[in-house]
Each structure stands twice: as structure tokens, then as C-alpha cells.
């Protein structure tokens, strides 16, 4: 089936995310304006206008009422999903690199970059009664990162922990009640982690790293379960909610890209078997590295956002579901 090509960004995509039901697809890019799309037909429903810098991250809450974004203009913003208005704008001392709502939707976490003389910090805020006064309130928790900066973040089970992926390849679990690190993965990855995404049941998550691999980890012990190897940096990876499949996307850094790379298959979405670690399919499409991937919650399609500024929504053919490993 022909993919849907969503063209609404002027610069490269930084992150895409589906809401829980999968009817909405959110995208953000370096062009300052996050977008929301109707995932079934690719219609753009609206933009969230207010940031003054590249938007690095976004997340939508469980009920699709609030959206949180973090940007290079040194703010994290909470938006009303339906009306597109800013509920709260939280100033920070450096760029906001990651942002996530907790599963309950009561809290949100975001992290700032190690830049301009500022250290990387992880912040927790209460968003139950979020309004403009949130910008003056102190965060409920603040954890300074003494080592490497956070490049990716997930909430752990029951909103009790936060899993962070770092620029040096480390993964750590933080107890948010104590504000302390409880598990450290060591150096399973030899280079920075670009993305982390949970499985549907939350028991494991997949990482995408600059060391050219994606790995599957246990969410509680951080034990490395599987490794998916490629030849170039992996920017994003996602786990199918219905099949034992993992999709990887990446490519070289934008500086190293040449126009011939497209022919060489360097910008494909690559499908691996979750358990056997074998690559079984590739899908072409983007003219440049893939920066973000997301499976639709029903597992029947997936979306990819690339350096070329396009979001592509690809619906799987029936043969995909019949693909049984011998």
C-alpha cells in the first residue's frame, strides 16, 4: 500500500508520537511548530504555535488532553491538545532535550542539556492542576546529572521510577521518591543513546544507539536481552505491540550524508525479529536519515519521521501478518 506522506514541517523531524488510541499522530521538528495529524488519512488538524527554537521532544498524556514539548528556546510547554493553547510555559536554563508524561498523567518529567555552563538536570512537575502559575512553581523533584547528559527518558512501572539513557551509552533507573539512582546498566552501549521505547506491557524497552546497535533491555533489572546489529548509527527503534518485531531507523549524521546514500539503502526502515535478532525486511522512503519511529497502537501500521522533514505513515499488507519464521 502507498504510504501517507505528511508534509507540514519545513525542517527535519525530531520526534513523532501516537496518542493511546492511535487516532492522532504528533510530530515536532527543528522548525519551532509541533503538528498534530489525523493518522487515518494524514489530515493535519493543527499546529502548536509558541516556541522560538527547535522543538526536540514531545509527549501526549493518556487521555489526549495535554501535550508537553521541550525546545531549544529554553522552555518546556504544556499545551491543550484540542484548542492548541499554551497551558503553562516553564523556563529552564538550557535546552529541554526530553519530556514525558507519567502513565497516571499526574506528573511530567523533563531534562535539560549540559550546555552554556549549565549541568544536565532531570525535573519532575505536578501537572494535575496545570495553569500559568506552573512557571513560577518549584519542581517537585530535581536531580542533577553529574556524569553524562540525558538523551532519552522513559517512565518505569507504576510511576515509581524513571529510566534515563545517556550520551555516553549508560542507562540508569532513578527512584523518584528518594531521588536516587537504583540501577545502572554499565556500558552495554559504547556510544550515546538516541532513543528508548517501551514494549506494550512495559516489561522491556528497546534502545537505539550511535554505536550502530539497538538493544532490548528488561525494564526493572536493565539486563540486556537481545542485540540488533546494523552498519550505521541507529536514531530510533520501536517494538511492535502485536508481533515479535522491532523496527530500526537511522543513517549517518546529516553532515556525512551524500545524495548517493539513498541508493545504497542507508535510510531504510529495517525490521528485525524480536527474539531471533534477524533482519527480515526493509522499507525505503526517506531521502535522508530517519530520526524517529513509532508503531501505531494497533500494530497494523507504523510512522517514521526523517531528516527530510516528511512524516510517512505506512500501513502493513496482509502478507506482513502471515510472515512466520520457520
UniProtKB/Swiss-Prot annotation:
Gene3D superfamilies, alphabetized:
YVTN repeat-like/Quinoprotein amine dehydrogenase (2.130.10.10)
Keywords on record: Cytoplasm, Initiation factor, Protein biosynthesis, Repeat, WD repeat
Where does this one sit in the cell?
Answer: Cytoplasm
Which spans of this chain does UniProt mark as WD repeats? 8-47, 50-89, 145-184, 188-227, 285-326
PROSITE patterns from the xrefs?
WD_REPEATS_1, WD_REPEATS_2, WD_REPEATS_REGION
Q: Which GO terms describe its molecular function?
A: RNA binding; translation initiation factor activity
The record's Pfam families line, in alphabetical order, gives:
EIF3I (PF24805)
Query: SMART domains of this UniProt entry?
Result: WD40
SUPFAM superfamilies reported in the protein's UniProt record: WD40 repeat-like
According to the UniProt record, one GO cellular component term is:
eukaryotic 43S preinitiation complex
Where is this protein chiefly located? cytoplasm
Cite a single GO BP annotation: formation of cytoplasmic translation initiation complex
- In UniProt terms, what function does this protein have? Component of the eukaryotic translation initiation factor 3 (eIF-3) complex, which is involved in protein synthesis of a specialized repertoire of mRNAs and, together with other initiation factors, stimulates binding of mRNA and methionyl-tRNAi to the 40S ribosome. The eIF-3 complex specifically targets and initiates translation of a subset of mRNAs involved in cell proliferation.
Family annotation (PANTHER family) = EUKARYOTIC TRANSLATION INITIATION FACTOR 3 SUBUNIT I
Give the multimer and partner information. Answer: Component of the eukaryotic translation initiation factor 3 (eIF-3) complex. The eIF-3 complex interacts with pix.
Similarity field? Belongs to the eIF-3 subunit I family.
- Would you tell me the protein name for this molecule? Eukaryotic translation initiation factor 3 subunit I
Q: Which organism is it from?
A: Drosophila simulans
Specify the taxonomic lineage.
Answer: Eukaryota, Metazoa, Ecdysozoa, Arthropoda, Hexapoda
Gene label: eIF3i
Amino acid at each position: 500500500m502507498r504510504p501517507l506522506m505528511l508534509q507540514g514541517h519545513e525542517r527535519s523531524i525530531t520526534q513523532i508520537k501516537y496518542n493511546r488510541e492511535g487516532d492522532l499522530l504528533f510530530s515536532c521538528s527543528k522548525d519551532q511548530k509541533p503538528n498534530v495529524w489525523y493518522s487515518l488519512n494524514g489530515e493535519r488538524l493543527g499546529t502548536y504555535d509558541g516556541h522560538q527554537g527547535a522543538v526536540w521532544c514531545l509527549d501526549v498524556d493518556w487521555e489526549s488532553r495535554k501535550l508537553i514539548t521541550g525546545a531549544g528556546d529554553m522552555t518546556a510547554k504544556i499545551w491543550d491538545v484540542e484548542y492548541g493553547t499554551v497551558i503553562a510555559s516553564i523556563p529552564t536554563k538550557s535546552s529541554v532535550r526530553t519530556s514525558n508524561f507519567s502513565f497516571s498523567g499526574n506528573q511530567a518529567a523533563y531534562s535539560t542539556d549540559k550546555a552554556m555552563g549549565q549541568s544536565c538536570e532531570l525535573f519532575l512537575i505536578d501537572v494535575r492542576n496545570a495553569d500559568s502559575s506552573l512557571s513560577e512553581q518549584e519542581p517537585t523533584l530535581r536531580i542533577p546529572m553529574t556524569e553524562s547528559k540525558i538523551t532519552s527518558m522513559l517512565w518505569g512501572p507504576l510511576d515509581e521510577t524513571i529510566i534515563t539513557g545517556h550520551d555516553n551509552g549508560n542507562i540508569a533507573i532513578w527512584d523518584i521518591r528518594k531521588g536516587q539512582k537504583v540501577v545502572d546498566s554499565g556500558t552495554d552501549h559504547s556510544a550515546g543513546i538516541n532513543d528508548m521505547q517501551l514494549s506494550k506491557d512495559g516489561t522491556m524497552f528497546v534502545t537505539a544507539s550511535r554505536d550502530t546497535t539497538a538493544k532490548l533491555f528488561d525494564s526493572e533489572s536493565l539486563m540486556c536481552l537481545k542485540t540488533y546489529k546494523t552498519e550505521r548509527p541507529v536514531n530510533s527503534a520501536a517494538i511492535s505491540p502485536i508481533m515479535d518485531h522491532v523496527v530500526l531507523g537511522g543513517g549517518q549524521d546529516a553532515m556525512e550524508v551524500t545524495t548517493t546514500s539513498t541508493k545504497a539503502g542507508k535510510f531504510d526502515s529495517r525490521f528485525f525479529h524480536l527474539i531471533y535478532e534477524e533482519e527480515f525486511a526493509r522499507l525505503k522512503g526517506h531521502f535522508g536519515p530517519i530520526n524517529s519511529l513509532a508503531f501505531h497502537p494497533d500494530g497494523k501500521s507504523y510512522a517514521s519521521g526523517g531528516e527530510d522533514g516528511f512524516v510517512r505513515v505506512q500501513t502493513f499488507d496482509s502478507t506482513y501478518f502471515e510472515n512466520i519464521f520457520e
